[in-house]
């Protein structure tokens, strides 16, 4: 397995171009299964999960190629099962189920894998599809969906806010008969992006980005060209990199309007922030960040995918900061690794209390999930001495060329190839 070797400490300063959003590109690629004509998807990041998704679409019978953009032609899809071999590494594969049953009347997806972050049940996806008229069975480790004829529009009230299930229901409902209303829908920018992609193909969707989405079913979806929005979590990660190292960064090709909660907390931590239409600059003017209190929440609240990075910020900040995780259980697995580097913290249930220290020390640490692994790499950049981050395949699932971008900010980081 590959690992990163990071020599610190470094004040990270420079300019970074942000890639397309993984959490929008994945559902958009799966939603391309709904289209009877070719689609071109631009600004798709180069990530392990994207490669897996493209391979999966190919196994279903779609023609998929990448030459800058990703081109998907699902007109000849003739396989309706997403097998365990591909699905085992990636939770997002559940997004194949809705488009398959909506367009072809049947679909099977092996129960998915992915990051080890507590319970992420597929129950809400299943319940939503059942309310649209699908019959669902769980057999031999597979979720099997079928419907006679077409799915039927329904008034669906989500039991809890779920990004993944909102996308599944919205995508499937585009080809249902009649009108579907999703109440208590998730509001994340990636849902808006997926809706806009579907609208480009001819879907009739309104209200995406609010807690009530309305979908008027259509007979078919055609082709089109769509550009994926910038990755707000990658943007936030590089902003934190500059903040914890008392440095400066300009993030280009990003969307400041998707990061209001994160920018507010960075300003509270003492960062000097400026924004334009497609850029954000952060300058610490050489000052240590101040500890902040963070509580994760569904959008437009503070994103859970920035929690690990802000845990690190608090652990090197001036003062004591409290972080409460309300979205996922078991999402503080990075904290014991940071304690190995000299951080002071206590975990109490879904809260971590961070006592800021002046410096961290390099150590051998292990990545446990995508965002946790990013925080360990950033910690290595500011720690005294050498940090080795193991199991970085987690990072490759969600960050496009993170070491190259950190090097542009001055980091001394090297990828050591595994056997």
Swiss-Prot record:
Q: Which reaction does it catalyse?
A: phosphoenolpyruvate + UDP-N-acetyl-alpha-D-glucosamine = UDP-N-acetyl-3-O-(1-carboxyvinyl)-alpha-D-glucosamine + phosphate
Q: Which UniProt keywords apply?
A: Cell cycle, Cell division, Cell shape, Cell wall biogenesis/degradation, Cytoplasm, Peptidoglycan synthesis, Pyruvate, Transferase
Q: Please tell me whether the keyword Transferase is annotated for this protein.
A: yes
The record's GO molecular-function terms, alphabetically, read: UDP-N-acetylglucosamine 1-carboxyvinyltransferase activity
Q: Quick one: which residues bind phosphoenolpyruvate?
A: 22-23
Q: Where in the cell is it found?
A: Cytoplasm
Establish whether keyword rRNA processing is in the entry.
Answer: no
Which top EC class applies here? transferase
Q: Which residues carry this modification: 2-(S-cysteinyl)pyruvic acid O-phosphothioketal?
A: 115
What pathway does this protein act in? Cell wall biogenesis; peptidoglycan biosynthesis
Could you tell me the Gene Ontology terms of the biological process aspect for this record? Answer: cell division; cell wall organization; peptidoglycan biosynthetic process; regulation of cell shape; UDP-N-acetylgalactosamine biosynthetic process
- The active site lies at 115 (proton donor)
Residues reported in the UniProt entry to bind UDP-N-acetyl-alpha-D-glucosamine = 91, 120-124, 160-163, 305, 327
Please give the GO cellular component terms listed in this UniProt entry: cytoplasm
Q: What is its main location?
A: cytoplasm
**Role this protein plays:** Cell wall formation. Adds enolpyruvyl to UDP-N-acetylglucosamine.
Q: Which family does it belong to?
A: Belongs to the EPSP synthase family. MurA subfamily.
For this entry, the protein name equals UDP-N-acetylglucosamine 1-carboxyvinyltransferase
| Species | Sodalis glossinidius (strain morsitans)
């Amino acid at each position: 397995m590959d690992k990163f070797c990071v020599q610190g400490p470094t004040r990270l300063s420079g300019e970074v171009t942000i890639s397309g959003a993984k959490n929008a590109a994945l559902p958009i690629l799966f939603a391309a299964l709904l289209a009877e004509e070719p689609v071109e998807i631009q600004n798709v990041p180069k990530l392990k999960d994207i490669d897996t998704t493209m391979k999966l679409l190919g196994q279903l019978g779609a023609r998929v190629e990448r030459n800058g953009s990703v081109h998907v032609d699902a007109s000849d899809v003739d396989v309706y099962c997403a097998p365990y071999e591909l699905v085992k590494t990636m939770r997002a594969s559940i997004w194949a189920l809705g488009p398959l049953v909506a367009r072809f009347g049947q679909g099977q997806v092996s129960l998915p894998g992915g990051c080890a972050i507590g319970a992420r049940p597929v129950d809400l996806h299943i319940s939503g599809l059942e309310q649209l008229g699908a019959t669902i069975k769980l057999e031999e480790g597979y979720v099997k969906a079928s419907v006679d004829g077409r799915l039927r529009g329904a008034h669906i009230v989500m039991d809890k806010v779920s990004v993944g299930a909102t996308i599944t229901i919205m995508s499937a409902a585009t080809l249902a008969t009649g009108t579907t209303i999703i109440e208590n829908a998730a509001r994340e920018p990636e849902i808006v992006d997926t809706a806009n992609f579907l609208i480009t193909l001819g879907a009739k969707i309104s209200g995406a980005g609010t807690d009530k989405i309305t979908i008027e079913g259509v007979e078919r979806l055609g082709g089109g060209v769509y550009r994926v929005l910038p990755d707000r979590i990658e943007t936030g990660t590089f902003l934190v990199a500059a903040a914890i190292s008392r440095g400066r960064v300009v993030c280009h090709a990003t969307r400041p309007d998707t990061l209001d909660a994160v920018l507010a907390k960075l300003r509270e931590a003492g960062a000097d922030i400026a924004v334009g239409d497609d850029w954000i600059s952060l300058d610490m003017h050489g000052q240590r960040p101040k500890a902040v209190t963070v509580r994760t929440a569904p959008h437009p609240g503070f994103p859970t995918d920035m929690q690990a990075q802000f845990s690190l910020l608090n652990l090197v900040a001036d003062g004591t900061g409290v972080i409460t995780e309300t979205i996922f259980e078991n999402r503080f697995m990075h904290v014991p690794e940071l304690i190995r580097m000299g951080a002071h913290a206590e975990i109490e249930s879904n809260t971590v209390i961070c006592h800021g220290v002046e410096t961290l020390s390099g150590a051998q640490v292990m990545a446990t999930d995508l965002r946790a692994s990013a925080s360990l790499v950033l910690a290595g950049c500011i720690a005294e001495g050498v940090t080795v981050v193991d199991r970085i395949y987690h990072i490759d699932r969600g960050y496009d060329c993170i070491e190259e971008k950190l090097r542009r900010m001055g980091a001394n980081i090297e990828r050591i190839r595994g056997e």
